[in-house]
């Protein structure tokens, strides 16, 4: 009944330079929904980072390698890592429950309130401000920009939005019957994965092969899917041959799926003859399943390949800097994920797909200085590069004000050392070129 009573307690980690009130501030979070910020914190941005094998092999058991991050953007900007409610040590308090803040619309409102208070408490109203989000952060980030700049309390403009492997438009990511968007969006990442695992017959470089796959997907495959049963048998056969060429899948398999192979089936089928499945977050990873003959893999072998190292790293770092809490640090919470409210749902039925990309276009229209950086990995089978490219072009975004960067890596491209180096170089340039 008391609107001024505390509703939630945010846990966050800040790195601030002394007497640096004019320095840019980067507010960073991961995705899920239901994920804490440890992945960006300990993987690439923070002063200390965990090093997992760059070649997509398993991280094994501790001790793991935690090193100084000499490329951290801390040299140019202050960093604030935010754990959304229900993740990390952030919790609803008093009579409030986490479910009140778990939703597409609810989540950015409470995080925007946190940022407003942080800016006020730290006297940073005239500092350049950036939002950096990964994965579901591609949903949260654009909504947060709108919530900050047009909120009912105090409007706050943001200088830029940085999205890592963004999941900003679910139409391009969800494999539902009748939705062709993910099929032509995922195909180039299927092609890159098949190329990496030597399942394609080509003398071309990866870059050339990947570009060819995008052109095929956009100009031939996508239109063929739109034709549905109107497609001629001759054209369908031609499309299936090219699909097989780019993906490394057999013609029979492609035909059985009516040219619409979902990502889970692709991950299981590509290396089936070798007894492996490939990873979802990073398809360079491969491992065996309990049943080689199943339709889907047992788990995401790429997540299994690095999660332990990251969780160990955040707990080790917090212990080193004196963080002591009488509760569990929730690196990821499935309860948050499965309790998340989507505004397109009514009585359990989907009536549409969440899409926050129009918020990016809106920010561009009303803030002449607003700019965007998008990074993605060619081997990401969760939020592929071409899906991000498609939904940016499909929602009136001014691409002249977008830096779009592709990496020969996965969802967390910073697990790949050359991509780690280039990503941080580009982030620094993006901030400094304001």
Regions found by a protein language model. Give the residues of each.
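N-terminal cap/lid subdomain of alpha/beta-hydrolase-fold enzymes
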Residues: 6-100
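A catalytic-pocket lid/entrance helix-loop region that shapes and gates access to the active site
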Residues: 46-52, 145, 149-233, 237-242
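Alpha/beta-hydrolase active-site loop
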Residues: 73-74, 84, 101-119
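Alpha/beta-hydrolase fold nucleophile elbow
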Residues: 124-136
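Glycine-rich nucleophile elbow surrounding the catalytic serine of serine-hydrolase chemistry
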Residues: 133-146
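Alpha/beta-hydrolase fold catalytic core
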Residues: 227-382, 394
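Catalytic histidine neighborhood in serine/cysteine hydrolases
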Residues: 396-412
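Catalytic histidine-centered segment of alpha/beta-hydrolase-like enzymes
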Residues: 410-420
């Amino acid at each position: 009944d008391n609107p001024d009573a505390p509703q939630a307690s945010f846990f966050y980690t800040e790195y601030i330079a002394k007497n640096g009130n004019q320095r840019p501030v980067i507010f960073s979070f991961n995705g899920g929904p239901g994920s804490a910020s440890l992945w960006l914190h300990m993987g690439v941005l923070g002063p200390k980072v965990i090093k997992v094998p760059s070649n997509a092999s398993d991280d094994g058991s501790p001790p793991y390698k935690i090193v100084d991050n000499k490329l951290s953007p801390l040299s140019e900007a202050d960093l604030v890592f935010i754990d959304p409610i229900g993740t990390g040590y952030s919790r609803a308090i008093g009579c409030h429950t986490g479910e009140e803040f778990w939703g597409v619309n609810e989540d950015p409102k409470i995080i925007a309130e946190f940022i407003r208070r942080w800016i006020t408490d730290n006297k940073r109203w005239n500092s350049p401000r950036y939002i950096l989000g990964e994965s579901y952060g591609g949903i949260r980030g654009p909504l947060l920009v709108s919530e900050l700049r047009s909120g009912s309390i105090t409007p706050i403009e943001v200088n830029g939005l940085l999205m890592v492997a963004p999941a900003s438009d679910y139409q391009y990511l969800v494999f539902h019957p009748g939705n062709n968007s993910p099929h032509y969006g995922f195909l180039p990442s299927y092609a890159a994965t098949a190329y990496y695992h030597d399942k394609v017959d080509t003398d071309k470089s990866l870059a050339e092969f990947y570009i060819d796959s995008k052109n095929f997907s956009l100009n031939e495959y996508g239109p063929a899917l739109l034709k549905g049963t109107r497609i001629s048998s001759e054209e369908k056969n031609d499309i299936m041959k090219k699909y097989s060429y780019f993906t490394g899948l057999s013609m029979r398999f492609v035909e059985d799926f009516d040219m619409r192979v979902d990502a889970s089936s692709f991950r299981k089928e590509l290396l089936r003859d070798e007894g492996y499945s490939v990873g979802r977050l990073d398809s360079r990873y491969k491992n065996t399943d309990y049943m080689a003959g199943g339709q889907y893999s047992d788990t995401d072998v790429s997540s299994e390949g690095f999660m332990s190292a990251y969780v160990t790293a955040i707990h080790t770092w917090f212990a080193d800097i004196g963080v002591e809490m009488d509760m569990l640090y929730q690196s990821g919470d499935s309860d948050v994920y499965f309790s998340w409210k989507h505004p397109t749902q009514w009585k359990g039925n989907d009536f549409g797909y969440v899409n926050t990309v129009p918020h990016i276009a809106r920010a561009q229209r009303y803030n002449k200085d607003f700019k965007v950086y998008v990074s993605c990995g060619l081997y990401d089978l969760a939020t592929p590069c071409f899906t991000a490219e498609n939904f940016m072009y499909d929602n009136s975004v001014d691409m002249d004000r977008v830096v779009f960067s592709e990496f020969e890596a996965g969802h967390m491209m910073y697990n790949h050392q050359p991509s780690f180096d280039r990503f941080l170089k580009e982030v620094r340039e993006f901030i400094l070129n304001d």
